[in-house]
Amino acid sequence: MNIQKMMQDAQQMQEKLQRHMAEMRIEATAGGGTVYVTVTGNKQLISIRIDPAAKDDMEMLQDMIVAAINDAHRRVDEALAGQMQNMMGDMGLPR
């Protein structure tokens, strides 16, 4: 396989991965389901649901929102790492 072909294949796979990540939806919760967030594979926050009973403790609610978003971002990172390993395997590179 020549280098130019390998580079073209890598670019196509990267574009495919970017499209896949943009379409991906990752969900995470905090506080036993009190806060529920959804982010895209690009880490864009697209929804937050909060149990109305949580409004009585704003400081805790704020912490739960941050925790849920951070967990969602961690899950995106894990998904991306898995996708990258699959891509490397598809290209015949060591994982």
What are these regions (language model features)?
Residues 1-27, 74-95:
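Long amphipathic alpha-helical segments used for membrane anchoring, targeting, substrate engagement
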Residues 1-2, 60, 64:
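Residues at the start of alpha-helices and the adjacent loop-to-helix junctions
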Residues 10, 43, 65:
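Residue-level signature of catalytic and energy-coupling elements of molecular machines
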Residues 23-25, 29-49:
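N-terminal intrinsically disordered, cationic/polar leader segments
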Residues 34-36, 55, 73:
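Short beta-strands and strand-coil junctions in structured, solvent-facing domains, enriched
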Residues 36-39, 43, 71, 91, ...:
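Alpha-helix boundary/capping detector
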Residues 44-61:
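A short interface-forming secondary-structure element
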Residues 64, 68-76:
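Stable alpha-helical structural segments in soluble proteins, enriched in small hydrophobic residues
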